[in-house]
A protein has these predicted regions:
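Loop-centered beta-sheet repeat module
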Residues: 151-205
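Conserved short beta-strand elements that form part of the metal-binding/catalytic scaffold
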Residues: 34-71, 115-139, 143, 186-230, ...
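Terminal peptide-recognition signature
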Residues: 81, 177, 239, 314
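C-terminal, well-structured subdomains that either form a transmembrane helix-short loop-helix hairpin
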Residues: 235-238, 242-244
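C-terminal catalytic subdomain
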Residues: 244-246, 253
Length: 350
């Protein structure tokens, strides 16, 4: 975003994403494979903190919690995310004044009361102003001894995460982020596969660190609609994790048993013509099914990305490396869309 874009909420990036499942061991196993060891345990609740780089994942398995109620409704899911802000109390008051719905306040004795509002699909958006050297985890969590088993995969931060919404609701949620946090649209996509299509508005915070593409289907059979049916509503579709070496990261994750979506063989035949001057090894890309996009000839750099299979209900992860490109892989959307359509055909959805 432009440095002059007003930032009334003082946003400064993602602090964490919170996950839940009726069987939380599924999440613990997955996070182990992704290279996220348990680094802390909540002092009084069945909640664990998993970290790699500047990415914080929380598993909430507390029995009588909002998270577990969310899991009963949606299945394995991402029930909350947290934004870093300059002043959480101010941001919370301002959000309510602008029409946000307050989230549940459930802090116990000697626990931080982190303000939150209702977000996509009834999930929560926490507002956190303690991060970095002084963090929310210092109060509520007890550090765990370093794991000798977890092999990190080089993931550095949350690059972006996406929302899937009902048809006709994309502009509603874009407006939500515009009104409350002064997000701006930085990309608009209209993607048509061979049988299905989607619309997407990529929204970015004034600080430039919180990016949320919002996806809407153009028909009743796309992967967006499949997600909405399986998830029983709108929600977070995928979380994109950044790396400085996507080849090494993918190799480590595959060795841990993480499965990725494939790319059509024909995709790599057109890479040199579509992304001229990219300087990547086609063999290395093809071998790992990594996608590439960008326009280095116009000084826009390249972007490398790959997507896991669905791993938390209908939710999946993206691994992304930016080499001077600030897009979302628009040129890859069609290739990804077609590869997911092929999977839908195999599973009898299409």
């Amino acid at each position: 975003m432009n440095a002059s874009t007003p930032n009334p909420m003082g946003t400064d990036g993602f602090e964490f994403v919170e996950y839940t499942a009726e069987d939380p061991q599924l999440l613990r196993t997955l996070f182990g494979r992704l290279g996220f060891p348990v680094v802390a345990q909540h002092r009084s609740k069945n909640v664990t903190l998993h970290r790699q780089g500047d990415v914080n994942f929380i598993i909430n398995a507390e029995k009588d919690s909002f998270a577990q109620a969310f899991a009963r409704q949606h299945g394995p899911s991402a029930c909350a995310m947290a934004f870093r802000v300059k002043d959480a109390a101010f941001a919370y008051r301002r959000a309510l004044e602008l029409g946000a719905k307050p989230g549940p306040q459930s802090a116990g004795p000697m626990e931080l009361n982190i303000p939150c509002i209702e977000g996509i699909g009834g999930s929560l958006i926490y507002l956190v102003d303690l991060y970095g050297e002084r963090s929310i985890y210092d109060v509520d969590f007890r550090p765990e001894p370093p794991s000798t088993q977890a092999e990190v995969a080089g993931l550095t931060c949350i690059d972006h995460l996406t929302h899937n919404v009902m048809r006709g609701r994309m502009d509603v949620w874009a407006g939500f982020y515009e009104k409350l946090f002064n997000f701006r649209e930085v990309r608009y996509f209209d993607i048509e596969g061979k049988q299905t299509g989607l619309l997407s508005r990529a929204m970015t915070s004034p600080c430039g660190k919180i990016r949320i593409p919002i996806n809407e289907s153009q028909d009743d059979k796309s992967q967006i609609e499949e997600y909405l049916r399986e998830y029983h509503g709108e929600g977070i579709q995928h979380i994109a994790l950044a790396t400085n070496d996507i080849y090494g990261t993918v190799d480590v994750l595959r060795s841990h048993g993480v499965s990725f979506q494939s790319a059509p063989d024909s995709y790599y035949e057109g890479v040199d013509a579509r992304v001229q001057g990219h300087r990547e090894s086609l063999q290395a890309l093809r071998q790992r099914a990594i996608l590439i996009d960008g326009n280095p000839g116009k000084g826009e750099g390249v972007l490398l990305q790959i997507f896991t299979q669905n791993v938390i209900g209908p939710i999946f992860f993206e691994i992304i490396q930016r080499k001077g490109n600030e897009g979302f892989g628009e040129g890859n959307f069609r290739a990804l869309f077609e590869s997911i359509e092929l999977d839908q055909v195999r599973r009898g959805v299409l």
